[in-house]
Amino acid sequence: MADNARAARMAKRIQTIVASAIERDIKDRRLEFVTITDVTMTGDLHDAKVFYTVRGASIEEEPDLEAAAEALHRARGQLRKIVGQQLGVRFTPTLTYSIDTVPEASAHMEALLDRARKRDEELAKLREGAAPAGDADPYKTSSKSESEE
């Protein structure tokens, strides 16, 4: 069983190798807009999960997730061979690919936080002109009559 530091180093190295291989060695146009975001390794260093994101050709264009997944699936053997050659370990880990949902989740969280900020601003504006419903201080305080008794 390998230590976690070695698994982390190997994962980072695999991320670099796969990203550069997609950019330089794999000639598939469906992988043009694929970015490798993270790699996680199992403790025995036999399996690596490669996380990726896909963007569209322009800001308005939606990414083609299915085509990118198919292209990565077709290139998995070639990518594993490249990883094995450059990694220099006895056993080349099996690579599995998974879409990274962190960017979408963070965009959703930003939208929720923006909505909460706008609501806070609305409440602050309403609070500016508000006055207490009763007296200024509705709580009973010690008065002179109690202290005189």
From Swiss-Prot:
One of the record's GO molecular function terms: ribosomal small subunit binding
GO annotation terms (biological process): maturation of SSU-rRNA
Top-level taxon: Bacteria
Keywords assigned by UniProt, alphabetized: Cytoplasm, Ribosome biogenesis
Protein localization: Cytoplasm
InterPro entries (alphabetical): KH_dom-like_a/b, RbfA, RbfA_dom_sf, Ribosome-bd_factorA_CS
Subcellular location, principal: cytoplasm
Span list, region Disordered: 123-149
GO cellular component terms, A-Z: cytosol
Disulfide linkage: none
Family recorded in the similarity comment: Belongs to the RbfA family.
Role, per record: One of several proteins that assist in the late maturation steps of the functional core of the 30S ribosomal subunit. Associates with free 30S ribosomal subunits (but not with 30S subunits that are part of 70S ribosomes or polysomes). Required for efficient processing of 16S rRNA. May interact with the 5'-terminal helix region of 16S rRNA.
Subunit structure: Monomer. Binds 30S ribosomal subunits, but not 50S ribosomal subunits or 70S ribosomes.
HAMAP family: RbfA (MF_00003)
NCBIfam families from the UniProt entry: rbfA (TIGR00082)
Name the record gives this protein: Ribosome-binding factor A
Source species: Corynebacterium glutamicum (strain ATCC 13032 / DSM 20300 / JCM 1318 / BCRC 11384 / CCUG 27702 / LMG 3730 / NBRC 12168 / NCIMB 10025 / NRRL B-2784 / 534)
Gene: rbfA
